[in-house]
């Protein structure tokens, strides 16, 4: 039996006892019992009501938390879907740009009437890296007998820069890409890289990356696909060693 029912039972018995009491002292004693039982019952009832209120409050808090969490989960799912769509759109745009670049290079190459020279290597680089590395690499490759498209050797006064570079890209067996901090920040080398990527997709050339004072993480941030390619590193090999390794491919 619960305490509340026990208190009610005591109060009921006391009430009956008062009705049947024959002496005043017995009535007073039973009245005291009735008051105690009534107080105990009221206290127990209040405690039960307090507990019920606390349970209701906790249930309300839980419901509010679940509603907030559901909303947060919905927003997270929405953000993931938006990010996936953004990445998909970027990939689609980039693929379209590469296809357009490839088409442009083919059109330019077929439209020109002059005899086009073929090259073993096209060197894509930032101008800031010429003095420190690129010009020495170009000289070493040429000394080994390689035919290279290198702006300092190939471009002449009055040449169309875009047309000549498109011709060089289209007529080179390999595309050497000198990846550096300067390369990552320049638009023109990035356009050359897009052209080489288009050629590689079409099976017309191969990209040969050279890391020049950059880390794997820096390359991966710029281009995850380039970071996965086996690369030569100017921090590990000399210019002559790099040139010989490249020349062995032709």
Curated annotation (Swiss-Prot):
Its EC number is 3.2.2.-, 3.2.2.6. Residues 1-46 are annotated as: Disordered. Residues 30-39 have a biased composition (Basic and acidic residues). Its main location: secreted. The keyword Hydrolase applies. GO terms for biological process: signal transduction; symbiont-mediated perturbation of host cell endomembrane system; symbiont-mediated suppression of host toll-like receptor signaling pathway. Disruption phenotype: Grows as well as wild-type in mouse C57BL/6 dendritic cells, decreased activation of mouse dendritic cells compared to wild-type bacteria. Increased host expression and secretion of TNF-alpha and to a lesser extent IL-12 compared to wild-type bacteria. Virulence factor that interferes with host Toll-like receptor 2 (TLR2) signaling, resulting in the reduction of dendritic cell maturation, inhibition of pro-inflammatory cytokine secretion and impaired NF-kappa-B activation in macrophages. Also acts on host TLR4. Binds host lipids. Has NAD(+) hydrolase (NADase) activity, catalyzes cleavage of NAD(+) into ADP-D-ribose (ADPR) and nicotinamide, also generates a cyclization variant of cyclic ADPR (cADPR), termed v-cADPR (probably 2'cADPR). Homodimer. Interacts with host TIRAP. Interacts with host TLR4, abolishes the interaction of host TIRAP with TLR4. This is Probable 2' cyclic ADP-D-ribose synthase TcpB. The lineage of its organism: Bacteria, Pseudomonadati, Pseudomonadota, Alphaproteobacteria, Hyphomicrobiales.
């Amino acid at each position: 039996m619960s305490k509340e029912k026990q208190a009610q039972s005591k109060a009921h018995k006391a009430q009956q006892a008062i009705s049947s009491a024959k002496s005043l002292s017995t009535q007073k004693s039973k009245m005291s019992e009735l008051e105690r039982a009534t107080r105990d019952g009221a206290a127990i009832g209040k405690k039960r009501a307090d507990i019920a209120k606390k349970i209701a409050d906790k249930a309300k808090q839980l419901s509010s938390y679940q509603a907030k969490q559901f909303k947060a989960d919905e927003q997270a799912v929405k953000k993931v879907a938006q990010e996936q769509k953004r990445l998909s759109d970027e990939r689609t745009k980039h693929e379209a740009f590469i296809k357009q670049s490839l088409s442009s290079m083919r059109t330019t190459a077929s439209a020109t009437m002059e005899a086009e020279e073929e090259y073993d290597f096209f060197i894509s680089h930032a101008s800031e890296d010429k003095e420190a590395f690129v010009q020495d690499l170009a000289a070493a490759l040429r000394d080994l007998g390689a035919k290279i498209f290198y702006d300092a050797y190939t471009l002449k006064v009055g040449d169309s820069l875009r047309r000549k570079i498109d011709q060089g890209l289209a007529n080179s067996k390999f595309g050497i890409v000198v990846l550096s901090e300067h390369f990552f920040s320049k638009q023109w080398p990035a356009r050359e890289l897009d052209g080489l990527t288009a050629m590689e997709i079409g099976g017309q050339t191969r990209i040969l990356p050279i890391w020049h004072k950059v880390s794997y993480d820096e390359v991966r941030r710029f281009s995850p696909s380039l970071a996965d390619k086996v690369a030569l590193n100017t921090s590990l090999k000399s210019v002559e060693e790099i040139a010989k390794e490249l020349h062995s491919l032709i």
